[in-house]
A protein has these predicted regions:
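Short, charged early-sequence alpha-helical segments and their helix-coil boundaries
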Residues: 47-63, 83
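Mature extracytoplasmic domains of secretory-pathway proteins
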Residues: 32-52
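Short acidic/histidine-centered micro-motifs embedded in hydrophobic/aromatic stretches
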Residues: 13, 27, 58, 62, ...
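Charge-rich, solvent-exposed alpha-helical interaction surfaces
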Residues: 6-9, 23, 41-44, 62, ...
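Short terminal alpha-helical segments
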Residues: 1-35
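Alpha-helical structural elements of signaling/regulatory helical domains
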Residues: 30, 51-55, 76, 80
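Amphipathic alpha-helical binding modules
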Residues: 62-103
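Secondary-structure edge/capping motif, primarily at the C-terminal ends of alpha-helices
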Residues: 17, 21-27, 49, 73-77, ...
Length: 103
C-alpha cells in the first residue's frame, strides 16, 4: 500500500457515496471487510504522517466529528450489531486521535 492508496481508501470508506457510514444508515450493517480495509489504511497513514505537522485537508475533514455520524436510529440493529458498530466507532476514533496526535 502506498500513501495515495491509503488516502483513497479512507476517502471512499468515510466520505464516499457507498461509505461505511452510508451503509450503516441504510441498515446494511457493518461491512467488516471495508472496516478492516479502513483500519489498515489509517494505520499506514499514522506511520506516514507521524513526523509531519501537516496532513491533507480532505483527510482531516474525513474525521471531523466522525463519532457523530455513527449515531442514528438504533432500531435498525440488534444489540449485538449495535455493540459491534460501537466498537468500530471507538477503533476509528482511537486511530484518528493517533493520526492527528501532535505531541
Amino acid at each position: 500500500m502506498n500513501k495515495n492508496e491509503a488516502l483513497n481508501l479512507v476517502y471512499e470508506n468515510i466520505l464516499g457515496e457507498h461509505s461505511i457510514l452510508i451503509q450503516l444508515r441504510r441498515g446494511e450493517g457493518l461491512n467488516e471487510d471495508r472496516f478492516n480495509e479502513l483500519v489498515t489504511a489509517m494505520q499506514f497513514l499514522i506511520v506516514e504522517y507521524k513526523d509531519l505537522d501537516i496532513v491533507p485537508k480532505k483527510l482531516a475533514l474525513s474525521f471531523v466529528d466522525i463519532s457523530n455520524y455513527f449515531y442514528f436510529n438504533e432500531d435498525k440493529y440488534s444489540l449485538e450489531e449495535q455493540n459491534l458498530i460501537e466498537d468500530a466507532v471507538q477503533k476509528i476514533s482511537q486511530l484518528a486521535n493517533e493520526l492527528f496526535d501532535y505531541w
